[in-house]
Amino acid sequence: MYIDITHYLTVSALMFTIGIAGIFLNRKNVIIILMSIELILLSVNLNFVAFSAFLHDLVGQIFALFVLTVAAAEAAIGLAILVVFFRNRGSIAVEDVNVMKG
């Protein structure tokens, strides 16, 4: 069986849909929202790599590496902010994020 570009695009669209659904269906847990954003970025990277392989061009794969680098930095900074927020407030609920001390 030959796996062509439609299989990759179908998996990518499914991953993107699951990521969007994770954001909209669970608005209370910040960690799940961050994981959903990472899933969306991973599906975009799969699109870049699939089109890059289909068109025999390396630009999509190089761009996917840049997106992975930015996603890793975003995850590290987001988790660091969550750790500091949890130490100060004792909770990571989204409802507690908008309550700020002046």
From Swiss-Prot:
InterPro entries associated with the record: NADH_UbQ_OxRdtase_chain4L/K (IPR001133), NUOK/Mnh_C1-like (IPR039428)
Subcellular location: Cell inner membrane
Top-rank lineage group of the source organism: Bacteria
NCBIfam families per UniProt: PRK05715.1-2, PRK05715.1-3, PRK05715.1-5
Keyword hit for Plastid: no
Cellular component aspect of the GO annotation: NADH dehydrogenase complex; plasma membrane
Gene Ontology process terms (BP): ATP synthesis coupled electron transport
Function per UniProt: NDH-1 shuttles electrons from NADH, via FMN and iron-sulfur (Fe-S) centers, to quinones in the respiratory chain. The immediate electron acceptor for the enzyme in this species is believed to be ubiquinone. Couples the redox reaction to proton translocation (for every two electrons transferred, four hydrogen ions are translocated across the cytoplasmic membrane), and thus conserves the redox energy in a proton gradient.
Keywords: Cell inner membrane, Cell membrane, Membrane, NAD, Quinone, Translocase, Transmembrane, Transmembrane helix, Transport, Ubiquinone
A Pfam match: Oxidored_q2
The protein's Enzyme Commission number: 7.1.1.-
GO molecular function: NADH:ubiquinone reductase (non-electrogenic) activity; quinone binding
Subunit structure: NDH-1 is composed of 14 different subunits. Subunits NuoA, H, J, K, L, M, N constitute the membrane sector of the complex.
Protein name: NADH-quinone oxidoreductase subunit K
Residues annotated as transmembrane: 5-25, 31-51, 66-86
Chemical reaction(s) catalysed: a quinone + NADH + 5 H(+)(in) = a quinol + NAD(+) + 4 H(+)(out)
Record's bilayer topology term: Multi-pass membrane protein
Gene: nuoK
Family: Belongs to the complex I subunit 4L family.
The UniProt record lists the keyword Transmembrane helix: yes
